[in-house]
Amino acid sequence: MDNIKLDFQKHIDAGRCNGAEWIINHKNNIYHEVIGYKDLELKNKLKKNSYYRIWSMTKPIIGFAAMQLIEKNFLSLDDTIDKHLSDFKNLKKLSSIESNLKNTTSLENKPTVRQLLQHTAGFTYNSCDNFLAKEYEDRSLFHSASSSLEEEISKISELPLLYEPGSKWHYSISVSYTHLRAHETSQ
């Protein structure tokens, strides 16, 4: 185990990663170790069983978890997202893709769980090329390892959607909102 810890420390020291956590089961002996930082800038130490952002790699995991919740009747694909995430009860949309934050209109339909999973809920992503994505970026949404998904949902719920839910496909952060519901239900 010491060699593994030393190897990870070399990667941390070289700046290739902030930290690492591993669990090894060998001959019915469980080894669970952690080293490094959850947030390098703030020097917040990584703790065992921390939550990790693995960005797009979460999508298949979240899809699987969502299907399990649907099978157990904790979630329906046709539920509006404000049923599970009350921060989203007053969503609006931009009047046009070139709009500013003051130029919004009411939604014809609230986004659903199905639309979250299909990237058709009206959200965007800060790496996309549109006004709202720039606003996400300016507010440092989805960057900080020190802010929780709950905090980011609260911030993003204050912003309008890019377009009417269900009207088109647009890659977005929306699948992560399903993750929060899956996490809450599993507690």
Where are the language model's segments positioned?
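Non-transmembrane alpha-helical segments in soluble domains
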Residues: 5, 9, 67-70, 81-82, ...
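Short, charged, amphipathic alpha-helices and their helix-cap/turn boundaries
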Residues: 32-33, 83, 133-164
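Short, conserved catalytic-motif segment at the N-terminal edge
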Residues: 1-54, 74, 90-102, 157-162
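Short, conserved phosphate/pyrophosphate- and ester-handling motifs at nucleotide-, phospho-/glycolipid
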Residues: 59
